[in-house]
């Protein structure tokens, strides 16, 4: 009977000892886990912030050569295009000296009847020419207009009202030339009305030298 009691006490002591050690281990694990979790969380946040700062610094210090070259190219192209448009605008709206306008050749419409079928009305006032009308002829394009119409037009414009040829681009700027411009009538045949005829501008000095 005594032996059984001793055995029971021994088993109970062992069980109590094991249970006590298990409870201590569990309590230790419960105490360590929150600390480890906190450290892991802090390290993750630190690594994330460091990576974000690294990317930001790399982005801010990236080479600007390509972007600067592209911007410079766009700026130069825009400036050149603006300059060309400004030049054309200035030429179109430039005023012509009155002395140059007065030097442009004059003719009477009756001398042109039957010779130029495209010359029937004034492109400025849109009125048809009559035999008594005095016209002024523009060089190069050979378009003619009423004297008062084209003179008023050229005071504020430097282009032909009909074809938009620019008189300034033709080198006809400033004051009138010292030589006199005359209208020469060229005919390929006899004096018949059906023969091909044309008009040209020439310098009176060249005519006299011939």
From Swiss-Prot:
EC assignment: 2.3.2.27
Keywords: Membrane, Metal-binding, Transferase, Transmembrane, Transmembrane helix, Ubl conjugation pathway, Zinc, Zinc-finger
UniProt topology in membrane: Single-pass membrane protein
Top-level taxon of the source organism: Eukaryota
Any one of the GO CC terms: membrane
Segments of this protein annotated with the region Disordered: 187-210
Zn finger limits (RING-type): 122-164
UniProt-listed PROSITE patterns: ZF_RING_2 (PS50089)
Localisation per UniProt entry: Membrane
Coarse class of the protein's main subcellular location: membrane
InterPro entries: Znf_RING, Znf_RING/FYVE/PHD
Molecular function via GO: transferase activity; zinc ion binding
Catalytic activity as recorded in UniProt: S-ubiquitinyl-[E2 ubiquitin-conjugating enzyme]-L-cysteine + [acceptor protein]-L-lysine = [E2 ubiquitin-conjugating enzyme]-L-cysteine + N(6)-ubiquitinyl-[acceptor protein]-L-lysine
UniProt xrefs under CDD domains: RING-H2_EL5-like
Group of enzyme by EC: transferase
Pathway(s) served: Protein modification; protein ubiquitination
GO biological process: protein ubiquitination
Pfam families (UniProt xref): zf-RING_2 (PF13639)
Coiled coil spans: none
Family: Belongs to the RING-type zinc finger family. ATL subfamily.
Record text about domains: The RING-type zinc finger domain mediates binding to an E2 ubiquitin-conjugating enzyme.
Name the record gives this protein: Putative RING-H2 finger protein ATL50
Species of the source: Arabidopsis thaliana
